[in-house]
């Protein structure tokens, strides 16, 4: 008899012992459990936004639902202003960030020399700095420049954060584009800038679309910069929700209604932009 025949059989693991159908059922149950884990807070938020104020605290009134909370929230001018400001700042920050990030990523991908190396090192250093450590210096800078509690006071920090992070991703997108197409365009008379605009940039559209969605969602959900760099002139929705916490308690029903209003645009962008994000990140 051979040594292989005399060797003891290797015990099967738990997943190997299961039949293929049993493994599929097990994975399906695990997926359902994970989905429920993430969906439960959202469901609770929506249900709380539809309950009257007393229904949040008393179980016997928990089955009463109303949409009056949304009317009460939208009747407050500061909430409407915050909703519009959040949308405007998210859109403008995304547009500015894409313009700077595209050129930054292209430079890091195509050029070598002191300037690209210095820019790469600067981005790397800023990415090593903890996010919270930026807040206090930015507060003093915006105060000195006179842009505290203005659109620019929020836009510039967001653009700086996006450029430092997404330049790395854009570099990867441009690294995946064959530079010979740009060289062919330059032989036909295009300048380097023309080759970038007419050849490299259109080829990077899937990546730019993915970054645009990520930038918009990040800015829409951002809280810390909005809390420190704004006051009354530029209310942001993430900060306005905190006004329902006061010395008399927490107005959970109104806070939840405002949170659902904030969740709506982000959910729409995520649902319709999911395939673009996946496609862009696969480039």
List each model region and its residues.
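A hydrophobic, multi-pass inner-membrane permease signature
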Residues: 2-283
């Amino acid at each position: 008899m051979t040594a292989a025949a005399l060797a003891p059989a290797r015990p099967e693991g738990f997943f190997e012992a299961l039949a293929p159908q049993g493994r599929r059922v097990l994975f399906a149950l695990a997926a359902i459990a994970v989905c429920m884990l993430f969906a439960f807070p959202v469901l609770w938020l929506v249900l709380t936004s539809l309950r009257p104020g007393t229904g949040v605290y008393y179980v016997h009134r928990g089955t009463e639902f109303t949409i009056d909370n949304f009317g009460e929230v939208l009747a407050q001018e500061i909430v409407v202003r915050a909703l519009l400001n959040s949308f405007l700042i998210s859109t403008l920050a995304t547009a500015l960030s894409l313009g700077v990030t595209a050129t930054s990523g292209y430079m890091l991908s195509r050029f070598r020399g002191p300037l690209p190396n210095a820019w790469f090192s600067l981005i790397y250093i800023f990415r090593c700095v903890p996010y919270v450590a930026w807040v206090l210096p930015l507060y003093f800078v915006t105060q000195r420049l006179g842009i505290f509690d203005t659109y620019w006071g929020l836009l510039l920090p967001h653009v700086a954060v996006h450029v430092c992070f997404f330049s790395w991703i854009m570099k990867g997108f441009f690294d995946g584009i064959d530079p010979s197409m740009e060289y062919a365009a330059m032989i036909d008379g295009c300048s380097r800038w023309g080759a970038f605009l007419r050849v490299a940039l259109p080829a990077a559209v899937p990546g730019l679309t993915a970054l645009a969605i990520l930038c918009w969602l990040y800015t829409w959900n951002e809280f810390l910069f909005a809390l420190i760099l704004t006051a009354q002139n530029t209310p942001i929705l993430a900060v306005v929700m905190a006004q329902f916490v006061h010395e008399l308690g927490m107005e959970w029903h109104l806070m939840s209604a405002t949170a659902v209003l904030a969740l709506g645009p982000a959910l729409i962008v995520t649902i319709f932009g999911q395939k673009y994000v996946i496609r862009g990140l696969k480039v």
